Amino acid sequence: MAFTNYSTLNRAQLTFDYLHTNSTTHAFLFGALAELIDNARDADATRIDIYAEKREDLQGGFMLCFLDNGVGMDPNDVINVIQFGKSAKRTPESTQIGRYGNGLKSGSMRIGKDFILFTKKENTMSCLFLSRTFHEEEGIDEVIVPLPTWNSQTREPVTDNMEKFAIETELIYKYSPFHTEEEVMTQFTKISGTSGTLVVIFNLKLTDNGEPELDVTSNPKDIRMAEISQEGVKPERHSFCAYAAVLYIDPRMRIFIHGHKVQTKKLCCCLYKPRKYTFTSHRFKTRAEQEVKKADQVAQLAEEKAREAESKARTLEIHMGGDITRDSRVMLRQVQNTAITLRREADVKKRIRDAKQQALKEPKELTFVFGVNIEHRDHDGMFIYNCSRLIKMYEKVGPQLEKGMVCGGVVGVIDVPYLVLEPTHNKQDFADAKEYRHLLRAMGEHLAQYWKDIEIAQHGIIKFWDEFGYLSANWNRPPSDELHFKRKRAMQVPTTIQCDLCLKWRTLPFQLSAVEEGYPINWVCSMNPDPEQDQCEAFELKQKIPLGILKKAPKTQEERQKQLTEKIQQEQRKLKALKKIKPIHSQSDLKKLPLEVTSRPFSKYPAHIFQGPQSSFHVVKTNARRRPQSRHAPFRQLQRSSIICTNPKPPFLVDKTEAVLLQPPETPQKSVSLLVKTIPQPPPLVQSLSPSVVPKSNNPWKVETPQIMNTPVAEMPYVPVNPSLVICDHKRSPEVSDEIEDEDRRKRMCKRGRFTVKKEKIQASELSDSSGEENPVDLKTAQKDKGLYVEVRMMGECYKGHVTAVEVGDNVVWWKVKFEDMPKDSTPRDCWVEKGSENVWLVKPSPEYQSTDEQQEDRKGEEDTVVQQALALQQTSTSECFCTEPDTTASTANHKTIDLLVQILWNCLHYFMPLSFPISKKELGAMNSEELLSLPLKECFKQYEVGLQNLCRSYQRCADSQAKVSEESLRISQKKLQETEEKLQKLRTNIQTLLQMAQQGINIRADDELDAYIEDLVSSDD
């Protein structure tokens, strides 16, 4: 049937409303802006400028412009732009980001109602105008796109229909911000080179309060999201500058916002202790199956065309018969050549299909890169790229889902090829959710392995972050800006910066001056202190990342036996269900069934499934009793002897324990420092909770607490405790009733940090005999200790805090110290300590802790406070902890300390003094403390750093020369080895020939057989 006959058939049309519908795919506004940057990157642009031009007459008050220096578009390319869904980039081997032929339209229409595009390529200048305002005012339902073209040299129209050209330019002058031909040509002149593209978006979308969605005024170097609070939001969510910095995994294009360069990042080069892992899987088949299906359709179509051409050639050859005229031979040869060409194409398509089918069976290989973000530890999670373009960011996987400190601060980076996972149209997610979840699961497993490999938890997580300046317990607080912390962070992660000319990435050696001053924005290779990388012609060195291996824990014999038993039981249940099924072979068998079976409606679940046993949570919660408050002396004496309450007892054992504690001791306690003899108790039998109360966690990374079993509890060995501490806090109980009871409390505590500590406060009245037994004068004097800033040694570590309560006993004063910055669940928030013991000492008071009233009272009784602190310092002078601070009132000790520090400083400078420093070591030894303070240490450090770098370079050159010598020696050895092997092989061949000449019946095929035969022959002669 001729194609002209199809003109009478109905056609699908694209309505004007689709422009708005298509734009709603971008829920994330920065994703729409990124679509326009993607187009510039796919056009091989090396620079893109994003800027705003004020136009008060337009909706939003400004126009948003995107100008790049890419290859541009000719008129035919521009025509393809207005065809929704058509893209020349859609090839399996393509590394370009564009796939769907929809990004320019959907992205620009999400930002504003109208856009106009100016592009240059070769000798043509084309303009494309897509306007919803034009369609609304003209009442047009179809999508009409003016598309005029000019000659770039003469600026004359390039068209065969001047009437059409006039209508197109008239619409542009009427509905665009450029109302004359001169203004339109001015936009073309902004494209400075011979090629490039300028996209201008106007009539911007507004928020509910009438302001534009994009804020271009608050920060002249950035484009921000309006009406989004920056507190608690990642910077990439509200700052387009931050989002553009990590938009590509390997940036090769300079991005400017309002004329200011964006400092793009290679995430893999910004991490501490990076490590990569290789992951292979057969699960990623969706994209490969789609490609195989397409290749099969193409191969079948090509095969049909080839068969049809071959059949046509045979028919023509038979029809011609004996006709051997020249025209007949030419016609036959043309048909045969066409058939041969189509057959070759069909064979190529078939081979491509077979190759893709074979690739479908092969596993897909991905590379995960993990590292610690020591600059911003709260910016952690997985950054998932597709064809080098960011799709998902800050995805929490594996242990990070627990919201603890485990794997906190770790960033993962992966670039997923298009053939493994396909992104959605808005490039903010992946199309196949099932395979994406499988990817996240795999990344979680490798993340847990990485956390084990870097051994941060083994050396202490808090200690690790303290070393880099994270001194606050609040996880979201930034690190300290003190110089030594900044230097340490800079030393651990080498600086990787991009050249502004060649766009190559260079890793710089550590420079002390760069920590304070930073690097220039327009950095070039000639500024590199490394002489081997100080030219743009030098090759870009790849980052060397150590390779890690996922070590899966082998299953134990019990786990394998349990899994096998469950599988056998499952198969037995299936077999029983199959035996109960009666096959129906005829209509008579169906009539034999009971009426209720044939007429009963289908129910997916039996009724008994919805009738589970009643939860026993209410019973457990009701029976759980708290420890009553007691003021008896024996209990107070026991607490003085440091009975550490870290193991909470079951509810029904509380009364029994209290009865034992409240009994009078057999012998009175003579000294507080003596340890109390533990009262032996028989191991009780604890009834396990019902399954409805105790939840089962399937999380493989969560450390499961031991469940309360129906077996006797093993008696714990006796551990000596510190006699001067009485810890009031308890470790969080694993019982479900306590967890549910304190759910609201945990939610409130989560705001203070990453961890919460459940408190069970013991009132201060438990630590006193009675109110009548205390001396009022002593109590009044002791109450002045409140607010003192002290330090307590507990469980082998020192913690600082304030005295919040004071109790007076028999010649003993007890302080209740509330600690600060205690992030761990296993550590108490406060404790009672004995004043004057060796485990507590005074430190400098903190003015921030005292209230206004307390500060006024302190000023009134300043002399009494000084006397008390002096007495307390005398009592704590025998402390063995290294944290004890000296008495600041002793001038002699101060002079000795200063002299000692000056001597230490002199020794350090004398040892590290550079040879080229203007001050000699002899002059340095004659300096006093004031002269040492005025010494130019920064210049000294800089010269020392230069000398150290020269020394390292000399070592590097020596090592390189030795490596070259070793490589040359290895090459010579390999050459000799090859020559020896060739001689040996030639000798074997000659021996085999000689043996065959001597013995004609011999048949030796392999070299091993020849060696064995010769060995037997020699041994037999002997």
UniProtKB/Swiss-Prot annotation:
Its main location: nucleus. ATP binds at N39, S87, A88, K89, R99, Y100, G101, N102, G103, L104, K105, K427. Disulfide bonds: none annotated. The modification Phosphothreonine is found at T827. There is a cross-link at K649, K758, K922 (Glycyl lysine isopeptide (Lys-Gly) (interchain with G-Cter in SUMO2)). One of its GO terms (biological process) is gamete generation. One of its GO terms (molecular function) is ATP binding. The modification N-acetylalanine is found at A2. Mg(2+) binds at N39. Zn(2+) binds at C499, C502, C525, C536. Protein is abundant in testes but not detected in other adult tissues examined (at protein level). Detected in germ cells with a distinct developmental-specific expression pattern but not in somatic cells such as Sertoli cells. It is an enzyme of class 3 (hydrolase). This is ATPase MORC2B.
